Amino acid sequence: MIYGGVGVDTVYPDSIYIGKGVRITAGTKILTHYLDPSQPGVHFLRGEVHIEDDVFIGLNVCICSSVTIGKGAIIGAGSVVTKDIPPYQVWAGNPARYIKDRAK
């Protein structure tokens, strides 16, 4: 279920994969491209976002491109996800960091 106010990158929306039983709450942003600092001017790089089954994403989370959020993971409110999250773990913060494992 995707709640109101979720922002999905409109440049490459086909690069976002969302599994079954996923809950994405209001204010979350999902990004599929980023500015390439090694290039002059404005040059974007594309990356996919994979959100596996039974993930819960709290309020106002930013999910950066080129990440996978593993099955059953929980992402705390206000987090910025910049790297892969393993299955059945709780992560939170800016940048998001490991908090603890959760029951499977």
List where the protein language model places each region.
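Hydrophobic alpha-helix-in-membranes signature
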Residues: 85-86, 94
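Beta-rich strand-turn-strand
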Residues: 59-83
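Flexible, glycine/small-residue-enriched loop-and-beta-strand segment within the central core
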Residues: 2-68, 94-95, 100-103
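Short-chain dehydrogenase/reductase
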Residues: 56, 74, 90-92
